[in-house]
Regions:
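Carbohydrate-active catalytic/glycan-binding domains of CAZyme proteins
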Residues: 1-548
Length: 548
């Protein structure tokens, strides 16, 4: 059986495609760089982090964008006629006054690892844009056209516009073609496909919260009209009817289903195997209950599907409830490399599993300056939306132990470095070494930001020598705490126990759609040049344990 989620941690809005025997899956990254991870599989069960699409933080400038803005809902497709991969993605610039100012772009590559073409601007009519490669060679871009006018149904409807690959521009204005297949409202995430005589439109409805779902419609004409699937929704965490068209809230916690491990299931994309089997990937979450807080963010899950005799897509078991265990395909099992638990930084390149907010990690993290270490150059404070030195990886379990060994000699109080548990620039816990002017020497202490409110735990600070120091973060379900050591054997706890559940979309006021990260960090708020050397980064997580 395939165990869900297939890609745990902050990996939302999955879009899947196949080229030959290889399956590729793209997810959203929002303010994090590198952007748009591509996961690879041979059997739909085992997945590896393969590459990233966006690696130039000058070409795609995310600096100064608030949390949860940036790269939204990439659409990854493979056009067999052209032997070409397409990625359509949006850069969300602002959600102020619910205007959702977004710019949508298209890029292509012959190889999934690139190089990718220069971005082609499509439009700014709405978000979650995707592309259809029609049988006749024409192409169409669909997206949610966000509604801002008073007196009109929110949040809007699915619109479509033709795209000219020759001219590299869309033709005319987008036209509305679909307003949903259920009464759940909050339609988004359209994917348009062609199978046989039908065009199928797959969407998410209900908001990307507890009433989330996958719906479908179909038409024999690309411009419609589209008929609703009589079973809608076809995949969800909360089966049953609901009418929420007038409710703009995306979270809708009243629809939490205590009978399901997987919550928020929706935003789907399907693929057919070489043997004709059908699988659908979708986002999902596993909240702490009863708090209903999803510390791991929105994750990627998969469901086995089938086509009915009357050409509708259904879950293989005939239900529409997302399952945590899914039948495997007939493809031969193919284990793939996993991200290593221990990184001793002996490689000449930084691992592709590291991310940084708004800038590329390589702009401040150097594995060549001192072989066997990563040197992190300090920049702005960790609350900044500009240039912040946080070298992070995704938290994939709420049962984890993260350890590092650091060499750092702060010279002024604006210098600090250490280990961090991070949701966004307004929510983090940082065990830091810094220069204490009061003590006249280096010290370690914890600094905590909770929805923008800063607390420095000076009562538990400890003076330390300027020698190598070990730092460790424990995450045990709802409880998280830090420890430190001189020798890496005898650790002592520092500070209090923190509430892991608060690192979540539901609790954090300044972000909505990402997930929790753990990592190494350094700040130099004077000259942006003082650095810390880290000998290793060890991440041990038990991904088999349930969230609760």
């Amino acid at each position: 059986m395939i165990q869900n989620p297939i890609i745990p941690g902050f990996n939302p809005d999955p879009c899947i495609c196949r080229k030959g025997d290889d399956y590729y899956l793209a997810v959203s990254t929002f303010e994090w760089f590198p952007g748009i991870p591509i996961y690879h599989s041979k059997d739909l069960k085992n997945w590896e982090l393969y590459t990233h699409v966006l690696t130039d933080d000058e070409k795609v400038d995310l600096k100064k964008l608030p949390s949860a803005k940036g790269i939204w809902a990439p659409c990854l497709t493979y056009c067999e006629k052209e032997d070409l991969f397409y990625v359509v993605y949006g850069v969300m610039n602002s959600m102020n006054a619910r205007y959702f100012d977004v710019d949508n772009f298209l890029i292509t590559a012959k190889d999934i690892k690139g190089p990718w073409s220069e971005p082609v601007y499509l439009h700014s009519a709405g978000f979650d844009a995707s592309i259809l490669h029609d049988d006749d060679g024409r192409k169409y871009v669909v997206s949610l056209e966000w509604e801002t006018r008073e007196g009109y149904e929110k949040p809007g409807a699915i619109c479509m516009v033709e795209y000219s690959a020759e001219k590299k521009e869309v033709i005319g204005y987008p036209k509305r073609i679909w307003n949903g297949g259920t009464g759940r409202g909050c339609i988004e995430a359209p994917h348009l496909t062609k199978r046989g005589e039908y065009y199928y439109i797959m969407c998410a409805e209900g908001g990307t919260g507890y009433n989330h779902c996958v719906t479908m419609g179909r038409s024999k004409e690309v411009w419609g009209p589209y008929e609703k699937d009589p079973m809608n929704p076809i995949v969800t965490s909360v089966p049953g009817y609901s009418n929420e068209r007038q409710d703009p809230d995306h979270l809708k916690p009243k629809y939490y289903n205590p009978e399901s491990v997987l919550q928020k299931s929706g935003h789907g994309s399907y693929v057919e195997t070489q043997d004709g089997e059908v699988y659908l990937v979708h986002l999902t979450s596993r909240p702490f209950a009863p708090e209903l807080r999803c510390t791991l963010g929105r994750e990627t899950a998969i469901q086995k599907m089938k086509w009915t005799e009357d050409n509708w897509l259904r879950m293989a078991d005939g239900s529409n409830l997302a399952k945590i265990e899914v039948p495997e395909s007939s493809l031969p099992e193919c284990p793939l490399p996993k991200v290593p638990d221990m990184d001793d930084f002996d490689s000449e390149e930084l691992g592709n599993w590291y991310y940084a907010p708004r800038i590329m990690p390589q702009s401040f993290a150097d594995v060549k300056a001192r072989p066997g270490y990563v040197r992190i150059r300090g920049q702005e404070s960790r609350t900044s939306l500009n240039k912040v030195s946080i070298l992070a990886r995704k938290l994939t379990s709420v049962y984890a132990r993260i350890t590092t060994k650091m060499e750092f000699k702060p010279e002024v109080h604006q210098h600090s470095a250490g280990l961090i548990l991070y949701y966004d620039n307004m929510n983090y816990i940082n065990l830091r070494k810094y220069y204490s002017q009061t003590l006249g020497q280096s010290a370690i202490s914890i600094i905590h930001l909770e929805n923008g409110v800063k607390t420095e735990f000076l009562n538990t600070r400890i003076p330390v020598d300027d020698c190598p120091i070990y730092m460790r973060l424990y995450i045990e379900g709802r409880k998280s705490w830090f420890e430190w050591s001189y020798d890496g054997v005898n650790y002592q706890k520092i500070g209090r126990i923190f509430d892991t559940t608060k690192f979540s979309d539901e609790y954090c006021k300044y972000g909505e759609f990402t997930g929790t990260m753990v990592g190494l960090t350094c700040a130099d708020r004077v000259y942006h040049r003082h650095y810390a050397d880290f000998d290793f980064f060890e991440y041990q997580a038990d991904e088999t344990k349930p969230v609760n």
